[in-house]
């Protein structure tokens, strides 16, 4: 991991009006996307890796000796898309094969932070599920957490704090060790390290877990849960429960808010931000195409949205790919992107001193 990188010349607001993206090649645009000071709120640390990193883990542990590199990537990852969120979750569970020991988990955290820095992210909220990382090899969640915190801290310090990183804890469903109550207890035990609490995995109506989420929220940990992502669900109950029962401050994905004017009005009134993950939504078939992705409708309706990469290891993408897609297919401008990042900064769960520093430096 080569820490020595050219510093990024981040865009200033007064520069934007002089940049004509329409006259640029794709390669030139990517240089601009990198220069946007990005605040990313929704990325799963346990699914944030490059193809090279993932393949090195597979080969190190001799996991698929009879498969070529291309076959390994097809077997585990979702870069070519699929049929549904359910299919994605099943593949993500396969990826837990690489969580073989604490060394690889620490290395994963280091690479994730460094790659986000190279992409031009200045404020990064990673989230991870202790039980998901632990379940395949029965690892100790305390030692997992120590490895992740150590890896993040080491790289942030090597980068002279040019990227600010925080963690959210996920209580999930969909694998044998999933236990939302245990994850909530773990989150509160390590509240010095976690800035928020989430639910991930299969999208379910979380009102059945109201007491657990109340317990976390009333203990001072804000909530952002996955809801309004899975278009195969027959109704919008997950969104209503997240907003009215759990009293979340943000929603992971939330794109199905676009299906209800009542929900649009509700998230605006309650100042709830939607952590939108455009490429993820298309690859999981929760949006039919990027041209028809609901983020355009939501943004135009005045809903606060931000741009996120979700599971870049599964998709073999990075956050700048999402910006390119939104520009190319939905005509979002640099001004729009700067506004979305200001919203993300405003709604970040990080300490106000860090947020003020980022705001003064970049916005």
Curated annotation (Swiss-Prot):
Question: Which Enzyme Commission numbers does its entry carry?
Answer: 3.5.4.4, 3.5.4.31
Protein activity control:
Inhibited by coformycin and methylthiocoformycin (MT-coformycin).
A Gene Ontology cellular component where this protein is annotated is: external side of plasma membrane
Q: Which domain of life is it from?
A: Eukaryota
- Keywords tagged on the record: Hydrolase, Metal-binding, Purine salvage, Zinc
Cofactor binding mode and count: Binds 1 zinc ion per subunit.
Question: Required cofactors, per record?
Answer: Zn(2+)
Explain the purpose of this protein: Catalyzes the hydrolytic deamination of adenosine to produce inosine. Unlike mammalian adenosine deaminases, also catalyzes the deamination of 5'-methylthioadenosine (MTA), a by-product of polyamine biosynthesis, to produce 5'-methylthioinosine (MTI). Plays an essential role in the purine salvage pathway which allows the parasite to use host cell purines for the synthesis of nucleic acids.
Q: What is this protein called?
A: Adenosine deaminase
The organism is Plasmodium cynomolgi (strain B)
Task: Provide the taxonomic classification.
Answer: Eukaryota, Sar, Alveolata, Apicomplexa, Aconoidasida
Task: Give the gene name.
Answer: ADA
């Amino acid at each position: 991991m080569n820490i020595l990188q050219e510093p990024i010349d981040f865009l200033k607001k007064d520069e934007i009006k002089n940049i004509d993206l329409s006259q640029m090649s794709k390669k030139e645009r990517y240089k601009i996307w990198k220069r946007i000071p990005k605040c990313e709120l929704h990325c799963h640390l346990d699914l944030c890796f490059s193809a090279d990193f993932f393949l090195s883990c597979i080969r190190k542990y001799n996991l698929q000796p009879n498969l070529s590199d291309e076959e390994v990537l097809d077997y585990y990852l979702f870069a070519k898309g699929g049929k549904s969120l359910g299919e994605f979750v099943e593949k993500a569970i396969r990826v837990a094969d690489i969580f073989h020991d604490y060394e690889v988990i620490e290395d994963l955290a280091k690479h994730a932070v460094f790659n986000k820095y190279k992409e031009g992210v200045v404020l990064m909220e990673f989230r991870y599920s202790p039980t998901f990382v632990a379940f395949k090899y029965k690892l100790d969640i305390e030692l997992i957490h120590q490895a992740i915190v150590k890896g993040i801290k080491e790289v942030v310090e090597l980068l002279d704090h040019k990227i600010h990183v925080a963690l959210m804890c996920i209580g999930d469903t969909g694998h044998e060790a999933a236990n939302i109550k245990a994850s909530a207890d773990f989150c509160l035990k390590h509240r010095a390290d976690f800035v928020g609490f989430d639910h991930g995995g299969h999208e379910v109506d979380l009102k059945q877990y109201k007491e657990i989420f109340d317990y976390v929220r009333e203990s001072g940990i804000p909530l952002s849960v996955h809801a309004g992502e899975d278009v195969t669900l027959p109704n919008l109950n997950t969104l209503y429960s997240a907003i009215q029962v759990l009293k979340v401050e943000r929603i992971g994905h939330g794109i199905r808010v676009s299906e209800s004017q009542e929900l649009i009005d509700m998230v605006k009134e309650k100042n709830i931000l939607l952590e939108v993950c455009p490429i993820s939504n298309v690859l999981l078939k929760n949006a039919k195409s990027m041209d028809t992705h609901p983020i355009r409708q939501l943004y135009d309706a005045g809903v606060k949205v931000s741009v996120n990469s979700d599971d870049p290891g599964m998709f073999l993408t990075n956050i700048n790919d999402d910006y390119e897609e939104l520009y190319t297919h939905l005509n979002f401008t640099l001004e729009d992107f700067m506004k979305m990042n200001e919203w993300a900064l405003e709604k970040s769960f990080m300490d106000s001193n860090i947020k003020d520093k980022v705001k003064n430096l970049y916005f």
